[in-house]
A protein has these predicted regions:
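Conserved polymerase palm-domain catalytic core
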Residues: 2-110, 116-125, 159
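Active-site and adjacent loop segments of nucleotide-processing enzymes
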Residues: 64, 68-71, 75, 121-146, ...
Length: 267
């Protein structure tokens, strides 16, 4: 019941070089455990890191060097941003006068998205408002995960979203599920890559969509699966195979859903 979920505005543009350099230290700690660790490799990594966070840019005939952030196309972007997110949240926590982050806060970060669960004894000391003001002091703009501007202290898990997925306790299979936002599900029909068998690709998208829709309520599942089937019949003259919502949920419960529906790209 004590959840905070958030996102940042202009995340890449507000990264601090001090924290970015600390991320390299964390990465180096990982390499220190390797049997074939060499100082020469560490020097190379440091040079690569400097060229990332203090990159040179050429704009017209002006050459300048940035003092923070990272260039577009950095292959480590997701990893770097996730670690930065985790460090920055801890910094704000400790700057708020609190101690022992790991025992009082459960946090997941991916890129500039995060979701936190607050222990009861800190929920009023480190809520959304405190976190937002803490980030503002270091020049970062923290907002709710849907960027609505809505202000709250904390909320329940079923009100949160993380990476476009919500949280819903399904009483039929007695587990929490992560329904993908409806817009994200249906967007897969808006475009496909060039192919010699368009229907085969669209049908695969439909199978994926049916499985994702099964995580929503019964009305949403039935209405949208029916519309998708009819649309494919109208355009291609063929109806894609689907199963009952109960069947999808049972497969999910038993850990077989991605085997039955391989089009799902769940990790």
């Amino acid at each position: 019941n004590n959840m905070v979920a958030g996102d940042f505005s202009n995340y890449d543009g507000t990264l601090h070089s001090e924290i970015l350099w600390r991320i390299l230290d964390i990465i180096e700690e990982h390499y220190n455990f390797e049997k074939d660790y060499r100082k020469e490799d560490a020097i190379v990594r440091r040079c690569l890191w400097e060229s990332t966070i203090n990159a040179f840019h050429l704009c017209g005939d002006e050459l300048y060097k940035v003092d923070h952030s990272q260039p577009s196309g950095n292959p480590a972007t997701a990893i770097l941003n996730s670690i930065y997110n985790s460090i920055a949240c801890r910094y704000v926590f400790y700057e708020s006068g609190l101690t022992d982050f790991s025992s009082k806060i459960s946090m997941i970060a991916y890129g500039d998205d995060n979701i936190l669960s607050l222990r009861n004894d800190v929920k009023d000391l480190f809520d959304q408002d405190v976190i937002t003001r803490g980030f503002a002091r270091i020049g970062m703009t923290y907002t709710d995960e849907e960027k609505t501007g809505r202000k709250y202290n904390y909320k329940q898990l079923h009100e949160c979203f993380f990476l476009q997925r919500g949280f819903s306790f399904n009483k039929m299979i007695n587990i929490w599920t992560g329904p993908l936002k409806l817009r994200s599900i249906l967007e897969c029909f808006n475009w496909i890559k060039e192919t010699t068998n368009e229907y085969e690709v669209i049908e695969g998208n439909a199978r994926m969509a049916f499985a994702e829709l099964a995580l929503h309520d019964e009305k949403i599942f039935k209405n949208n699966t029916a519309q998708i089937k009819q649309a494919l019949v109208n355009v291609y003259g063929q109806k894609p195979v689907s199963f009952t919502q109960t069947q999808y949920l049972m497969w999910l419960r038993d850990g077989h859903l991605t085997m039955k529906v391989p089009e799902l790209n769940w990790a």
